Every structure is written in structure tokens, then in C-alpha cells.
Regions:
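An extracytoplasmic/periplasmic, membrane-proximal ligand-sensing/linker region
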Residues: 31-53, 59, 208, 246-308
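Extracytoplasmic small-molecule ligand-binding "clamshell" domains
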Residues: 26-93
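Periplasmic-binding protein-like
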Residues: 35-40, 114-122, 213-244, 252-255, ...
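C-terminal motif of bacterial Sec signal peptides marking the signal peptidase cleavage site
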Residues: 16-19
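Beta->alpha turn/N-cap motifs
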Residues: 40, 70-74, 84-103, 111, ...
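Pocket-lining segment of extracytoplasmic ligand-binding domains
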Residues: 141-249
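Bacterial signal peptide processing site
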Residues: 21-23
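A conserved helix-loop-strand patch within extracytoplasmic ligand-binding domains
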Residues: 111-165
Length: 308
């Protein structure tokens, strides 16, 4: 019996020492890899396949070891920083504001899409109507997307408040394409939805990238029939964020490697497939102060908008 107790004691001590050794392993080693989180805004298999290419590149060019995880939601990513299960993550703007406030997470890069580091909202109305600018929406019926939609409500709401414009009635269409359809069909006087600038395709033809493109099949003449009457102020794109306890040297090496990767042909293809990203740009927390001020203006907080 005594021998059994001794054996169990030895095994227990060995287990504890092993666990402690693992916990003390330096970040970036095989025993304690840097945990990189990608939220599945597209098919998880697409992220899994392309993030492996990204992971292999980082390991080859930084000497660190990485582990890629695909959480189920932005909130899960935020809380992973609190439990130290995340070191780096691609996260949306509101998720970053929460993670920064609660856990000191740092935004070190922002994504670019077609050369733009920001995104905007737009107001649209019938091109042949009397509504030509945002100020003309006083006393009108306006469609928004959803109370928790950034480009479909929060940002355009700030635009209205800044100009002291009060519509007579507001409705929520639930989707960006529904907003455009309601304006096209005359169900509302105007609507607010996401805006991205038009770009030149491979054939040299300009293509619209705003919410109107979502109904091109249904309404081929939507670009002519529905006009943009105003744009919101620019808001910074989603950031790549880092846990604050990571060393400055480690952060610098990884940021440099990530920006180099996105500039390669395989990097461009991988990031475009994952998030429609074409480039990365260095960022700081101050870049997101405009979002904080926007939320104050409309009486919202980031936590409210992350519930949906």
C-alpha cells in the first residue's frame, strides 16, 4: 500500500511539473504556439485552407510557431483574449473596442479593400425625384437595415444627427438589398446602406461595389434609377489585433511578416478569399477614436451592437 502511495505521489508530482513546464514555455514555441484567431465571416473551410498557407509563411519567416483557430463569433474572440486563449485576431471594429477596453488589446494593422482603409454608408433615393441631398430627408420616410447594423443604421444615423435632419418615419428592412429594393419600388423615399467605391475590373470596366450591386440581377437599371444622395464620414476598416503582453520585438516581426505576405501573389489570393482583403496597413488605437465618438453621438455602445 505504501509503495502504491509513493508511486501515485511520484506520478502526481511529475504531472504537476510537466504542466508547469508547459505553462512556462516561451510564447511562439511548439509547446506554446502563438494563437491566431480568424472569425468565420465566410465558409470555415475557405478560412481553414487559406489560413494554413498564412500560418506556414509566418512560421518560415518569423521562427515562431503558430496555431490557427476559427471561433464561432466575434464575442468568442473577445473573451479569448481575457482567458489568454488568443494572441492575435482578425476582428470587427466594435469587437476591437470591447477587447481594448476590457483587456488592453492593441490594433496594429487595419485591412484595406481595393486600396481603401475605411468604409462608409450611403443614402440613396430615386434619381428622378426631388431628394438630392441628405438635408432633403426632413419629413420623409427612410429605410434602414437593422438597429445593430453599422453601415445600415449607426453610421447614417450619425450623419442625420450631425445635419439635424429628422425623417418623418423610419423602417427597418433587415438587409441591405431590401433597402435598395424598397427605394426602387417607391415603398420609401430614401434608404441607408453600405457603400464601397466603384472599381475597374480586369476588362477595364467600372463596376459598382455599393449595396445597389446586390439587386443588379433583379433591377439591371438600378445604377441609373437609384442615385447616391450623400455619404457618411469614413470609418476605419476592421483591424488585426494583438494581446498587449506580447513583446514589442515579437509584434514587430509578426506585423512585418504579415504585411510582406499580403504583398505576395499567394498572400493576396489567400486574404482576398478569407475577408476580401487586398492589403494591410499599420494602425494604432487612435485611428478608432472616430468610432468611439460616433457611438457617443448616437447614444450607443459597442457591447449593444455585438449582441447581434
Amino acid at each position: 500500500m505504501k509503495n502504491l502511495v509513493k508511486l501515485l505521489t511520484v506520478l502526481f508530482v511529475g504531472f504537476v511539473l510537466s504542466a508547469c513546464t508547459k505553462n512556462k514555455a516561451e510564447l511562439g514555441t511548439a509547446e506554446n504556439p502563438i494563437k491566431l484567431h480568424f472569425v468565420p465571416s465566410v465558409d470555415s473551410k475557405v478560412i481553414e485552407d487559406n489560413s494554413k498557407i498564412f500560418k506556414d509563411y509566418l512560421e518560415k519567416n518569423t521562427s515562431y510557431k503558430f496555431e490557427v483557430t476559427i471561433p464561432q463569433s466575434y464575442i468568442a474572440v473577445v473573451e479569448s483574449f481575457g482567458t489568454k486563449r488568443a494572441d492575435i485576431a482578425a476582428i470587427n471594429t466594435f469587437g476591437y473596442l470591447i477587447a481594448h477596453e476590457k483587456y488592453g488589446v492593441e490594433a496594429l494593422m487595419t485591412v484595406l479593400r481595393h486600396g481603401s482603409a475605411t468604409y462608409q454608408s450611403m443614402f440613396v433615393a430615386k434619381a428622378d425625384g426631388n431628394i438630392k441631398k441628405i438635408e432633403d430627408l426632413v419629413g420623409k420616410k427612410v429605410a434602414f437595415v437593422d438597429p445593430a447594423s453599422t453601415t445600415g443604421y449607426i453610421i447614417p444615423l450619425k450623419s442625420l444627427k450631425d445635419k439635424k435632419v429628422e425623417p418623418k418615419e423610419t423602417v427597418f428592412a433587415q438587409k441591405h438589398d431590401n433597402v435598395v429594393s424598397m427605394v426602387y419600388q417607391g415603398q420609401v423615399d430614401a434608404g441607408a446602406a453600405f457603400y464601397s467605391p466603384a472599381f475597374k475590373n480586369d476588362k477595364g470596366v467600372m463596376e459598382i461595389e455599393d449595396a445597389r450591386r446586390l439587386v443588379l440581377t433583379q433591377y439591371p437599371d438600378v445604377e441609373k434609377k437609384i442615385a447616391i444622395i450623400g455619404l457618411s464620414e469614413p470609418v476605419p476598416n476592421d483591424p488585426f489585433v494583438f494581446r498587449k503582453e506580447m513583446s514589442a520585438e515579437m509584434k514587430t516581426k509578426i506585423v512585418d511578416a504579415m504585411m510582406t505576405f499580403v504583398a505576395t501573389p499567394e498572400g493576396k489570393e489567400a486574404f482576398k478569399a478569407i475577408y476580401g482583403v487586398t492589403e494591410l496597413k499599420k494602425a494604432t488605437d487612435k485611428d478608432y477614436d472616430v468610432v468611439r465618438e460616433m457611438l457617443k453621438t448616437v447614444g450607443k455602445n459597442a457591447s449593444d451592437l455585438m449582441k447581434k
